A protein has these predicted regions:
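A short glycine-rich, Lys/Arg-flanked "PGG" loop and its adjoining helix->strand segment in the class I
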Residues: 139-151
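A short acidic, Gly/Pro-enriched loop at the edge of an enzyme's catalytic core
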Residues: 114-125
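Class I SAM-dependent methyltransferase SAM/SAH-binding core
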Residues: 57-115
Length: 269
């Protein structure tokens, strides 16, 4: 296992056995988007762009707790759809979520994105949403995504811009520094970097950016977010980090902590 810090975001053992043993940490980070103004429904945006039709084969690589699989189910996608994740805990959460919404359950596989157990040209549409920054060798994963996506099919990769949650990261960085910790959270692989890696591999790469903001009304959602981060794992007193973070938030009555959100997707063909 890697040393604590930014490297934990791509440490397979840590991710599988600690960070994503269940979907609790991921769900905590997902929950802050309830405070997004104006709201961006990224799942709908991505699937509207992809427009899967009829009986296309869809694979969600790094499916996490199954948000996109569940959305496919809600849309009554008629073709086969598959979720792949290296974490059994994530797959359990994905199965439960999809089972709550879909008329049928997706197939689910435990596998690494750099060695997918799929034949060449197996999928019509491949999703890789907010997962490449968890891969130690993103170029190798991109080669696999290219391999399993049929000629004429589409790959959609989701990543974040360099300014995504910048205000939150600034506050967390200052709080960690105040207790002598150097574990500044950062985007390990950004939207710009992903685009640079994908363009030599695909004939066409179209970028879509979705910029908004969070208006966080108090310390609770910030505290939940901080608890979910790898950077706070192994800290003897994580609550001291949370206290240091929340002490830096606006303290005026009714004042919200405003945080930039900048997600995007790259549609590759």
């Amino acid at each position: 296992m890697a040393e604590p810090g930014a490297g934990l975001w791509a440490d397979r053992t840590f991710l599988r056995e600690v960070q994503y043993q269940t979907d609790r940490n991921l769900a905590a980070r997902q929950s802050i988007y309830a405070y997004q103004q104006p709201p961006v429904n990224l799942m709908s945006q991505v699937l509207d762009l992809a427009a899967p039709c009829g009986f296309e084969v869809v694979a969600d690589i790094g499916c996490g707790n199954g948000l996109y699989l569940a959305e496919l189910g809600r849309r009554r996608h008629a073709g086969p759809f598959l979720g792949v994740d290296m974490s059994p805990g994530m797959l359990r959460a994905a199965r439960q979520r999809a089972g709550d919404t879909a008329r049928r359950s997706p197939a689910l596989l435990a596998a690494d994105a750099t060695a997918l157990p799929l034949r060449n040209a197996a999928t019509d549409l491949t999703l890789a949403m907010h997962m490449l920054y968890h891969v130690p060798e993103p170029g190798q994963a991109i080669a696999e995504l290219r391999r399993v996506t049929r000629p004429g099919g589409r790959l959609i990769v989701g990543l974040n811009g360099t300014d995504h949650l910048q205000e939150m990261r600034d506050v967390i960085t200052a709080a960690l520094a105040s207790i002598g910790r150097d574990r500044a959270p950062r985007e390990r692989l950004t939207l710009d970097q992903g685009e640079t890696l994908l363009r030599p591999v695909f004939a066409s790469v179209t970028r879509h950016d979705f910029v908004s903001r969070l208006l966080l009304p108090g310390p609770e959602p910030v505290a939940d977010y901080v608890r979910s981060l790898p950077e706070t794992k192994g800290v003897a007193t994580p609550e001291s980090v949370i206290a240091a973070v929340t002490s830096r938030l606006p303290d005026r009555p009714g004042a919200a902590f405003e945080v930039t959100t900048h997600s995007g997707c790259l549609v590759c063909a």
